C-alpha cells in the first residue's frame, strides 16, 4: 500500500513539474512574441509600431558607447537617456563603431575589446529601461573613431594596393572587414539583457554609414553598388530590424533637375537611386545650413532648409514610397551673432515644418536633433551640444515637439 502511495505521489509531482515547465515555456513564448510585436516596422511610406502609426521626436548622442566603455562614467549615459525620456524623446541615434584609437571597439580587423562591447551592451540596456529606441551606425565616413580611412589602412597593412579612402567601397578586403564588423555587432549577445542584438526590439534600425560620401565617383553609382551589397548582407543576418543608409540627402544623376536643390555641390551620393534599393527601409536627410550656407543670412538659410525638407519629403512619398527622417540638424553656438534665442527660434521653425509634413500621411516620421550631452562633457563640445538640464527653454521646445508628434500619431490619416 505504501508503495502505491509513493508511486501516486511521484506521478503527482511529475505532473506538477510538467505543468510548471509548460507554463514557463508559455511565458517565454509570450515574451518573445511581445518582443517581436515591439519592433518598429515600415508599412508603405510610414512607420508602424504594434500596428499603429509611429511618429517620433528624437536625438543624436554619438558618444554613448565610448563613454560607457568606462564603467565609472556610465552615469552620464543614464543621465542623458533619463532626461531625454522625460522630454518625451523616443529615438536615439548613436555609434556602434570605434575602429582603432582610444577606447576602440575594433582594435584591429576582427579583434574586439570586450570592455567596449560591454559599454554598448549597457547603452542598449539603459535605452530599453527608459523606453528609447536606438538607431545604431556601423562605420563613419570621416576619420573620427577610425572610419573608412582606418579600414583602408588595415587593408594596406594586409598588402592591398589602394589608391585612396574611397576605395573602401570597392576593395574586397575592406568590404570583407566591414561585413565581419556588421556580423559581429548584429549577432552580439548582450551580457546585460541576455538577448542577441538582432532579437532586441530596443534597436529600431541599423545604419550602414554615417554620412557616406565618395569623391571618386560623383554619379552615385559606386555608392549604389556598395549599398546594394551591404544592405543585402545585413538583411541576410537580420530581417527583423529596419535598415537605412545614413545619407545627408544630396541628389545625384538619376534625377538631374533635383541637383539644383543641393547646396552648390555633390558628394558622390544619389538620394533617389540609393534609397530605391529595396532592402533599404527608410530614407534620411541631414541639414546643417550654418555650414553649407555659412555666408548667407539666417532667413536665407531657413528658406533653403524648408525647401530641402519639402523636396525630400515629396520624393520619399511619391518616388521612394518610404518613410523619411531628418536624422541630423542643429544650430551651432559658434555661429557669428549666436544666442540661445536664435537656436530656439530655429528649432521651433524646424519642428513646425516636421509636424506639418508628418500630418500629411506620416511619411515624415520624425527628426533627430544633434546632439544631447550630459553635465560635465565640455570636451565633447562641437558647437551643437545641448544639455537639457541647463537649457530649460530649449528643453521646453523639445518636449512640446515630442508630445505633439506622439499625439499626431493617433490622428494622422494614412
From Swiss-Prot:
GO terms for molecular function: mannan endo-1,4-beta-mannosidase activity. Its main location: secreted. Substrate binds at residues 95, 210, 288, 370. One of its GO terms (cellular component) is extracellular region. Its EC number is 3.2.1.78. It holds the Pfam family Cellulase. The active site is at residues 211, 328. Keywords: Glycosidase, Hydrolase, Secreted, Signal. It catalyses: Random hydrolysis of (1->4)-beta-D-mannosidic linkages in mannans, galactomannans and glucomannans. It comes from the Eukaryota. It is found in: Secreted. Residues 1-25 form the signal peptide. GO terms for biological process: polysaccharide catabolic process. Induction: By gibberellin. Gene3D superfamilies: Glycosidases (3.20.20.80). Possesses endo-beta-mannanase activity in vitro. May be involved in seed germination by weakening the endosperm cap prior to radicle emergence. Belongs to the glycosyl hydrolase 5 (cellulase A) family. This is Mannan endo-1,4-beta-mannosidase 2. It comes from Solanum lycopersicum (Tomato). The gene is MAN2.
